[in-house]
From Swiss-Prot:
One of its GO terms (cellular component) is phagophore assembly site membrane. The lineage of its organism: Eukaryota, Fungi, Dikarya, Ascomycota, Pezizomycotina. Its main location: membrane. The keyword Coiled coil applies. CDD domains: Atg16_CCD (cd22887). Stabilizes the atg5-atg12 conjugate which is necessary for autophagy. The atg5-atg12/atg16 complex is required for efficient promotion of ATG8-conjugation to phosphatidylethanolamine and ATG8 localization to the pre-autophagosomal structure (PAS). Also recruits ATG3 to the PAS. Involved in endoplasmic reticulum-specific autophagic process and is essential for the survival of cells subjected to severe ER stress. Residues 64-76 have a biased composition (Low complexity). It is found in: Preautophagosomal structure membrane. Residues 78-186 form a coiled coil. This is Autophagy protein 16. Homodimer. Part of the atg5-atg12/atg16 complex. Several units of each may be present in this complex. Keywords: Autophagy, Coiled coil, Membrane, Protein transport, Transport. It comes from Emericella nidulans (strain FGSC A4 / ATCC 38163 / CBS 112.46 / NRRL 194 / M139) (Aspergillus nidulans). It is a peripheral membrane protein. Belongs to the ATG16 family.
């Protein structure tokens, strides 16, 4: 009984852990989606600014152009950096989607398994109740048969005692009868001898 209850409790705990892990994945996915959207908006704005700057700036004479000191990254560099960041975010998003799909599939399997385990547990509990009732009936039947056997053994013991007593009485009577026969035969023999003697002397 305790074994399957421990397994069921462990399965429920594993389900709770997976659901909590899914919450973290959902949050990370939402943050990544927000970050991706912000990056795409920033790229679009920078591209528009770069195009307007290129159209409004007059073409200068190459001979009059002087090298200007570095004043920070150019819009093109920023665009490239944002695109790289966007690509990394997209890759991370794909990984999160795969992880989310895998965990969701495992969660569904676990839920189906829990449903099956619940049905199996219910069936086993019903079977256990049925077997307990049958076992109780068998115990009662065994007690009744034990009482019957005990009574029968008592009757056999009483009968054997009576039989032994009857055999002893029969043996005693047979012995007494034999003694009576022997005495009678002896007396008859003496009487016959006496009659023979009397006949001879008459």
């Amino acid at each position: 009984m305790a074994h399957w209850r421990e397994e069921y409790a462990a399965a429920l705990a594993a389900r709770d852990r997976r659901e909590k892990a899914n919450v973290a994945i959902y949050n990370a996915y939402s943050q990544l989606a927000d970050r991706t959207a912000s990056s795409m908006i920033a790229v679009s704005d920078l591209q528009s600014d770069a195009q307007r700057s290129a159209l409004s700036t007059p073409v200068a004479d190459p001979r009059q152009q002087q090298p200007s000191p570095a004043s920070g990254p150019s819009p093109q560099d920023i665009i490239l950096a944002i695109r790289a960041d966007l690509a990394e975010a997209q890759r991370s998003r794909s990984e999160l989607e795969e992880q989310l799909a895998r965990v969701t599939t495992e969660l569904e399997k676990l839920r189906r398994r829990n449903i099956q385990n619940g049905k199996r547990i219910s069936s086993m509990e019903s079977e256990i109740t049925h077997l307990q009732l049958r076992l109780k009936d068998r115990d009662e039947e065994l007690r009744e048969k034990a009482k019957l056997l005990e009574g029968f053994q008592d009757e056999i013991a009483t009968f054997e005692l009576q039989l032994n007593m009857a055999e002893e009485r029969s043996n005693r009577l047979q012995k007494e009868n034999q003694e009576l026969i022997d005495r009678w035969m002896a007396r008859m023999g003496k009487e016959a001898d006496a009659m023979n003697d009397a006949y001879q002397f008459s």
